């Protein structure tokens, strides 16, 4: 006990510096927004998009060249995340982009990349999206790319493989690509930029299949679709294209994107190009909107964000600052709260297909994406608003009520919550040959469900309410044998376990329950010698990495919050975790985090949330201070 009292000034000073740093990051309008890092396919595909749309800015291309070379590793490859293994798809796309920009295959960075690509079987070993981009520029035959025809738009909402069986991100992508694949356009590369060398390999291709395994039925279906494509007459094709086009035009976001994410946005612009609609307001808005997602880098590079996270970052920052002790009516928090109120969505989106009678009230991840609010953001924002006092208290309460009711209405039949849709659990999309990329459905997840419960707990609800009781039962069913919980949207078991234990405590579950104690033991068993916690993105594919990896500030914070919620704030493990955050804090009050701790698609796409390294340690230290001072 005496030792902890000695440490108190250190963690308190660390928390004070963290608060000051977070406040310094707030934008004048009241929100927080950190760049969202991913991998270089974003920039490589941007280069090819500019070629296809005939809108190449040479200064921008040079900045992208600098960025791509900056991100290239010593062995000549690119990875999906820092410290990750070489990734063939990413390396192929970066190579093609660099050659288009003007680099020769004989330059050393290109030679290194080429040797790796050839050693893996070349283009034929790559994913569908990579081969599709190469088909668009004439470097791969369209007939070898799995087909998604626009006639998919005719499948009714109750029919297998209709577009609403796909997750929201895949749905918009499929609709846009259906138009592109219908026309199978080719925008040839200039002769100097062509890449026949990517076929120069004696290594057999190692192509992976669909996420769920294609199976002969789905392979036969794809062959049939290609056969149909070759016919001279497609009686319903034009009507299908019009339906797909109308669907896209109806769902363009206010910022010009589609879904607030890169893939459907790029493909929608290509679709509009091949439909000769480059003067259409939707195309102009979409093209101009790309600038918001670009980031100028201090060394002269330029990167493109897969998405942007201002609402998410702001909600988390408010929660962190309130936990750290800022008053509910602090002027900076009032400004943030009022900014969040303006982001509430009051029109139906795709979610209403499954919930037509549910009134809107959710929040989206981005600045302006009204058709795709998500449960995770809504839970965090409603929870954050519940910690504030604003000048217009009636408006705050009304917003919370709408958001709360929307979340309740989005509960899936198994008791959990998905991110964007209810019961988006069909397995069929995972078997389509086209779907060899990431997740294509949006089933309930442990971490989203946990954030909902912690939100509800902040209002005083507990498991006497059936909605919460069903969610708790869902979480108990999903617990892994070792005591941990999976993290769908954060890496990985540390994220899931930290969220779930905190949630169970928030809704009044006795943390002395054996299954919760097992989770806490798992957390303590995975602490690193330096006192922190870390988990490698490889844990999604190799169980040996579960809870293991170099320590990071955000993952240490998640582990600490589990221990604090579970009644172990005064444990040696918690003390050492806090000490890690104290010792690794920068002089300016922030933290460095070289590894990604966010997840887009497990096994396929990872994210570096640049605000996580600051908001989560602040939140954890604030909770630690409260727990220690209550003893």
Swiss-Prot record:
Active site: 376 (proton donor)
Catalysed transformations (reactions): squalene = hop-22(29)-ene; squalene + H2O = hopan-22-ol
One GO process term, biological-process aspect: triterpenoid biosynthetic process
Family matches, as CDD domains: SQCY_1 (cd02892)
Keywords from the UniProt entry: Cell membrane, Isomerase, Lyase, Membrane, Repeat
Pathway: Secondary metabolite biosynthesis; hopanoid biosynthesis
PFTB repeats: 15-56, 61-102, 241-282, 400-441, 468-508, 516-557, 574-622
Subunit structure as annotated in this protein's UniProt entry: Homodimer.
Name of this protein: Squalene--hopene cyclase
Natural source organism: Alicyclobacillus acidocaldarius subsp. acidocaldarius (strain ATCC 27009 / DSM 446 / BCRC 14685 / JCM 5260 / KCTC 1825 / NBRC 15652 / NCIMB 11725 / NRRL B-14509 / 104-IA) (Bacillus acidocaldarius)
This protein's encoding gene: shc
């Amino acid at each position: 006990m005496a030792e902890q009292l000695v440490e108190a000034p250190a963690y308190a000073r660390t928390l004070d510096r963290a608060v000051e740093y977070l406040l310094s990051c707030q934008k004048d309008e009241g929100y927080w927004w950190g760049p969202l890092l991913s991998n270089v396919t974003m920039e490589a595909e941007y280069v090819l998009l500019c070629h296809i749309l005939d809108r190449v800015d040479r200064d921008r291309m040079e900045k992208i060249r600098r960025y791509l070379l900056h991100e290239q590793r010593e062995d000549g490859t690119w990875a999906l995340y820092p410290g990750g293994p070489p990734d063939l798809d990413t390396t192929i796309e970066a190579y093609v982009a660099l050659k288009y920009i003007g680099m020769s295959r004989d330059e050393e960075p290109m030679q290194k990349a080429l040797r790796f690509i050839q050693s893996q079987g070349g283009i034929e070993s790559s994913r569908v999206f990579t081969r599709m981009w190469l088909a668009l520029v004439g470097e791969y035959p369209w007939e070898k790319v799995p087909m998604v025809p626009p006639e998919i738009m005719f499948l009714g909402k109750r029919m297998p493989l209709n577009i609403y069986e796909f997750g929201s991100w895949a749905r918009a992508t499929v609709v846009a690509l259906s138009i592109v694949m219908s026309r199978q356009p080719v925008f040839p590369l200039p002769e100097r930029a062509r890449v026949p060398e990517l076929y120069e390999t004696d290594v057999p291709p190692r192509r992976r299949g669909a996420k769920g395994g294609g199976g002969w039925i789905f392979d036969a279906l794809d062959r049939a679709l290609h056969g149909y494509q070759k016919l001279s007459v497609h009686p319903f094709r034009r009507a299908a294209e019009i339906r797909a086009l109308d669907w896209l035009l109806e769902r363009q976001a206010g910022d010009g994107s589609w879904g607030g994410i890169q893939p459907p946005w790029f493909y929608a612009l290509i679709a509009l190009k091949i439909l000769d609609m480059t003067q259409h307001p939707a195309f102009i808005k979409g093209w101009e909107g790309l600038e918001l997602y670009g980031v100028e880098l201090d060394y002269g590079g330029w990167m493109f964000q897969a998405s942007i996270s201002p609402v998410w970052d702001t909600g988390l920052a408010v929660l962190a600052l309130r936990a750290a002790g800022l008053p509910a009516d602090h002027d900076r928090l009032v400004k943030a709260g009022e900014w969040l109120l303006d982001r509430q969505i009051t029109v139906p989106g795709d979610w209403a297909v499954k919930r037509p009678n549910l009134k809107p009230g959710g929040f989206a991840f981005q600045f302006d994406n009204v058709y795709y609010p998500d449960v995770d953001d809504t839970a965090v924002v409603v929870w954050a608003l519940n910690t504030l006092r604003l000048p217009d208290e009636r408006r705050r309460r009304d917003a919370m009520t709408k958001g709360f009711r929307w979340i309740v209405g989005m509960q899936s039949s198994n008791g959990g919550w998905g991110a964007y849709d209810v019961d988006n659990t069909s397995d069929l999309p995972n078997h389509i040959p086209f779907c060899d990329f990431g997740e294509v459905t949006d089933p309930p997840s442990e971490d989203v469900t946990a954030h909902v419960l912690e939100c509800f707990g902040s209002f005083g609800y507990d498991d006497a309410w059936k909605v919460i009781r069903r969610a708790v039962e869902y979480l108990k069913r999903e617990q892994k044998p070792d005591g941990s919980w999976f993290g769908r949207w954060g890496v990985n078991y540390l994220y899931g376990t930290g969220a779930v234990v905190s949630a169970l405590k928030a809704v009044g579950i006795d943390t002395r329950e054996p299954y919760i104690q097992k989770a806490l033991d798992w957390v303590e068993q995975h602490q690193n010698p330096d006192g922190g916690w870390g988990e490698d993105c490889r844990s999604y594919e190799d169980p040996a990495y579960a809870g293991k990896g170099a320590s990071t500030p955000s993952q240490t914070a998640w582990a600490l919050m589990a221990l604090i919620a579970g009644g172990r704030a005064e444990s040696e493990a918690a003390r050492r975790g806090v000490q890690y955050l104290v010792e690794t804090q920068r002089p300016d009050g922030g933290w460095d985090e070289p590894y990604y701790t966010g997840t887009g698609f497990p096994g396929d796409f990872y994210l570096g949330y640049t605000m996580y390294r600051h908001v989560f340690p602040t939140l954890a230290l604030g909770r630690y201070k409260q727990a220690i001072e209550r003893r």
